[in-house]
Amino acid sequence: FIYSGWENTIVTTGFKMLDFIKGNATMEDVIRQLDEDQDSVVNNTPDVITTVTEELSQQDCAMLVGRCFAQATGSDLALVSLSTWIPGNPTDQNHYGVAAKLYAKGITDYDLSVILPTGWNRTIQTVALTGQQINDLLASGYDAYGNGKGYPYVLVSPVQPEAGKTYQVAICGVSDQLAAEATVTDSGVVGMDAAKAFFGAYTTISRADIAWS
């Protein structure tokens, strides 16, 4: 039995061993593949997308993610929930918000995956909301479990929304109630792809780069 699970030191070596069993490769080929796989892990240096020059708080990161998601989807603004701990909510808490901060260091795709509400491969959602609906959501937060204990939204916008005007909103955290009241659209834009492009446009990022103007 040759295990060829996801581990990146085993997958390709496992397949090469299967080739050996089938007579399509030599043992030297298997050893060479194993050496290459081990080297790729031990000496792997992920690409640095940008460099953060000072600690960015959870809210700072939410502001940057909001700009990124809004611009990537052609939205007017963004509502980004924060993954704070709320007593009484299920232990899963909020998987659709910004949950961490960024420290002063080179930023890789792994660092982005930690702060992105979409993780590695989920897509960005958008929704059409009036300014009044936006204000209501800011007051109530993302009510993930329908119990009135909402996770706070951060409004990311170049202008203050007008109550009677309708906006396209990139949103991170859609409650069942909101999904029933409004049309939520899958933009088809993968959050990680958008983030790599957005953050990669900066050689360095500091708090001075957060404002959307």
Where are these regions (language model features)?
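Catalytic centers of hydrolytic enzymes
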Residues: 1-213
